[in-house]
Amino acid sequence: MKYKFSHNFISYNLFLFVFMSLILLPYSHASSMGFNTSQHKFSVRTGETRIIYPLSSVKGVSLSVTNPQDYPILVQTQVKGEDKHSPAPFMATPPLFRLDAGMRGRVRVTRTGGNFPEDRESLQWLCITGVPPKEGDVWDNSQHDKKNNMQDVNLNILLSVGTCMKLLVRPDQLRQKPEEMAGKLIWHRNGQQLQVNNPTPFYMNFKSVSLGNKNIKLSSAGNENYVAPFAERSFSLPVDMAERPAEINWQIINDLGSESQVFKANI
């Protein structure tokens, strides 16, 4: 018996064979290759948790920064306003510098202008970010791994980690410390809201707040855990907390970044 194949039939099967070969070729090739995933974090460790900037300072203030990684990073510095977005009348130097593995450097913050009140603190933010290298940079350590693994598939994840720390501009006439006045905070309850009034000229940065035997989530007041000078803010209370007299306890973070004593009041 003789079979007759049309020209169109042969062309179609030839096309199908070539098409499937092109699809399967990368998979067969990948099976013989290694797939490597690595992650490099670019972060900076600071020697302080906050900066107290005397309003009359001319020379500015400085702080130490450390590269905790075992590879070099770039460090980017800038000062922002209280909203963490608007520019601030301060200059951080150097604005961009290299910090080798395990090494420590210093950043200086200097005021460049601005009008600040004389009767209370003002809040700015010093933001420090670890910056990874661009592909092709001489100091990019991943280039060496790429050359040694040309036959492998490499996924190198670079994580840039930034942090913003409080820059508290303090007038010279404020002789006391925040922890010396933290006991003057006024607390009261309004339904499921715990409200605090700050009659002092200092930013009060809370470490902990508890009402009765329940800890209050400071994040419920927003992204920050402080109350501004001569201002008020609210914290959400647990829904199951009954409205009855209770003792409130609070601690603040002092100028050194440590916990204060426990302050108490009845509300």
UniProtKB/Swiss-Prot annotation:
Disulfide bonds join 127-164. Coiled coil: none annotated. It is found in: Periplasm. One of its GO terms (biological process) is cell wall organization. Keywords: Chaperone, Disulfide bond, Fimbrium biogenesis, Immunoglobulin domain, Periplasm, Signal. GO terms for cellular component: outer membrane-bounded periplasmic space. Pfam families: PapD_C (PF02753), PapD_N (PF00345). Residues 1-34 form the signal peptide. It comes from the Bacteria. Required for the biogenesis of the MyfA fimbria. Belongs to the periplasmic pilus chaperone family. This is Chaperone protein MyfB. It comes from Yersinia enterocolitica. The lineage of its organism: Bacteria, Pseudomonadati, Pseudomonadota, Gammaproteobacteria, Enterobacterales. The gene is myfB.
